[in-house]
Amino acid sequence: MYLDEYKRWLAADLEDADLKPELARIEGNDEEIKDRFAVALKFGTAGLRGVLGAGTNRMNIYVVRQATQGLANWVKTQGGNQTVAISYDSRLKSDIFAKTAAGVLAANGIKVRIYDALMPVPALSFATRYYECNAGIMVTASHNPAKYNGYKAYGPDGCQMTDDAAAIVYDEIQKTDVLTGAKYISFAEGVEQGLIRFVGDDCKKALYDAIEARQVRPGLCKTAGLKLVYSPLNGSGLVPVTHVLNDMGITDITIVPEQEYPNGYFTTCSYPNPEIFEALKLGLNLATDPDADRVGIAMKCPDGSYELVSGNEMGVLLLDYICAGRIEKGTMPKNPVAVKSIVSTPLADAVAKHYGVEMRNVLTGFKWIGDQIANLEAAGEVDRFIFGFEESYGYLAGPYVRDKDAVIGSMLICEMAAYYRSIGSSIKQRLEEIYAQYGRYLNKVDSFEFPGLTGMEKMASIMQKLRDEPLTELAGHKVVKVTDYKKPEETGLPAANVLIYTLENGATVVVRPSGTEPKIKTYFTTLGKDLAEAQAQKDALAAAIEPILK
């Protein structure tokens, strides 16, 4: 069957000139053909993500058209403004895919608001809400290597699409022939017909105003003398991040020249992920990923070296800074709420408790943090939300968008650094003070990759075996509790393919398949009297679980 589909593509008059040579090159190679055509990229709550190329299991204009027709069919049942917002990052073909999606929507009579240049995830989420759209599309593969691209879908609240909506869109995609089933007009035709319009300056200004309103100590940075080295990792963060930092008074910004301008090949950093040290090894301090929803920093240590701050550590530092600062300034709301994912550090729970903040723990995926904001909004209590984070370098400190935002993350990190500098301290010193107060937590993530067509089956088999044969001990420590998030009646959260093992010494191990990549991730949390003890515990646990996950 996949050979028939391959032959159909080979015979078709394809508009993308890059696809024909690829199809010709793999002729007669059953393994290569099967990899491209045996399955289709699956549309889920995170949309699509895959390697660029020809076939149903690749990202190309035909797969984008098919997905967008499915989305359009759903939008047409939703009433409202019949409008979709679109943005895109610097990845290869992101602009082409964005305009392709706009053409499909316009052909279906759906209005489009698209950014006139690349803009990040938070800008897309904001525009979706600002224009009261039915949906939003962000063309990006986030932090994946350069050969990938993707398509994130958002609901009318600016949050990533719900399970129910994504299931309907997926069903509509299944009804749409990938090569011929989508309605389509050119981008120029859509503009001429008045169906496609660019996002206005009023929307961009409103976004910047909303971000800057969340400063904890407004005006501090104008006199702090903070010097910053910044890299947008050749992505979409350059304009919004520097705009906000300049507005708040940080003007001494050195941009890493090799990583300043959009470049989908990411030639200086093959894996443009701000949690990978390669992205920060040029001696810089701050980096945002290509779609600017995540931000990482390297802080300067007393000996002049740089140390990468983990996503968990930065989440705790920002929570601590926001709480202390808002209490000091009298801007802390009554009954404040913070939100984090279940795989993020329990140190944040201890910090929240210290400041009298309710900490809510949700499933992995920032949409669940957005869901908590929506619940507060529905109750007329959205001002209670002060901060949300995930260990994977995603932060949000306001309800103006419903996805992680590296722009506000960058702003608050810089403000925090400026504040500690102004009192003769540093981010590094404050982190050590937090550990001294609450205990030396260590949080580490390991990943096990399962490539190829059989990868997903292998992952499913491993997860099922862990449920059929529950672990009773790890590294000589008894497992005192197994929490299976596939049992919502026990967790109080929606069902998810996550297992958490709590050990007798207080350590935890979380095992979950990645939602976007063929990986099983393990999250280790250990607590020791010092870093060496916590690291030794983690190493022992990692060694014990590795053979189980291979």
Give the ranges of each region predicted by the language model.
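Phosphate/diphosphate-binding loops
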Residues: 116-177, 275-287, 292, 316-322, ...
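Conserved phosphate/anionic-ligand binding catalytic regions in large, soluble enzymes, centered on
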Residues: 37-57, 141-142, 228, 232-244, ...
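N-terminal small/polar loop signature for handling phosphorylated ligands or for N-terminal nucleophile
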Residues: 85-148, 244-295
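An N-terminal, well-structured beta->alpha segment
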Residues: 6-101, 190-191, 195-224, 236
